[in-house]
């Protein structure tokens, strides 16, 4: 067990690494040449899972297999100040989709001791030691029309490690549209929370099958720092 944990840590700790835009980054639908694709559509080589068999690359998406609670984090870099854009939908499940920011892989604890955002409608949780609660006034949920989690939605998270402010904007994708006009749904503020850590997809409990596609990250943030691209 100890050797297995060391292997996970060795594979995943790439702290503070600046991301270089990939050749195909200019092909993203957001007009930002500094966005880097996080998923090649065929395998999970850029990702590290908490458990074997929890996730799979299926039909061009990252598919949660619903086998257990756990996470899948991007292992090419860890980020503090960032822009993260993705599409999400839930195929099956009894809990909203969840993603994690500002966690840590050293040591590895439940949910990476991270701040949880629940796309696309803005639920939340604080997994940091001494917290493990809903976060109270640290989170602000903003009024918006409820987005159907069973259909594809676009979400953008922007985080500033220096200020401890992270925000999420989402919108429903219609038909074959590649993008949509987002609306801010959730804001988190705690100056003590911002840190360099992994960006992760989370399965809250067994039986949940969430899917993700079109994942892009920008760090450091060069294009419109502190502003959403998708609004």
Predicted region positions:
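Bacterial N-terminal signal peptides that target proteins for export
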Residues: 1-9
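Bacterial N-terminal signal peptides
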Residues: 8-18
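Sec/Tat signal peptide C-region and signal peptidase I cleavage site
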Residues: 19-25
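Carbohydrate-interacting regions of secretory-pathway proteins
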Residues: 25-231
